[in-house]
Amino acid sequence: FMSEIPDKSVSLMVTSPPYNIDISYGNKWKNRRIVSSKGKKYADKQSEADYRKMLGKVIKETKRVLKDDGQIWFNIKNRYENCVIQPPFWIMEYFKDMYLKNIVIWNFDWGGATQKRFCSRYEYVFFFTKNKDKYTFNLDDVKIPALNYRPDRYKSQLKNPTDVWKISLVSGNSPERTEHPSQYPEELVERIIKVGTHEGDLVLDPFMGSGTTAVVAKRLNRRYVGYEIE
């Protein structure tokens, strides 16, 4: 796994690993619902020990191929076990030799309904750098419209994003929708690649899924490499 990628050749890794909540990866999205597809499916319900061991191996290999000024963006969400929320902060164990710069809250506006707790409308995106100070951060490339802009008070109609990103999920009728049952939006990946890389840099996604990372990287003139679960 990743053995063909040279050491210290990747500028940025962005990924969203399997949730380990019994989603049938390999199924298809059809008519706004998940339907069974032919072929082998990844069993997204490993033991917790096996799941963490798998992620640990992937993260270890990512660090090997990451440049000294490289960065990792890791999307993961809370899980619920026995009616108790399980935050994903255990992943910090795998990044003790890196620098946590942000925990971005990805906020979206729709999802599943619940009756005995508030509906969840966010996931985490952990932003780690390999070097404490030396890393790419193209802030000007990801500025957003300032809704309260006043020419008498502000020089620009743009402002810096915060660590809360309001980006909608990919809906069933979205032009970017694929058959993958758990697809993250191009807008999310685009902001990450823009802020963390330059044209020609190599972007890695070890859990390629629907191919969103590759689509965005190509559009932004970045090189890319990705893997998918068999």
Stretches found by the model and what they are:
Residues 1-230:
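Core catalytic lobe of class I
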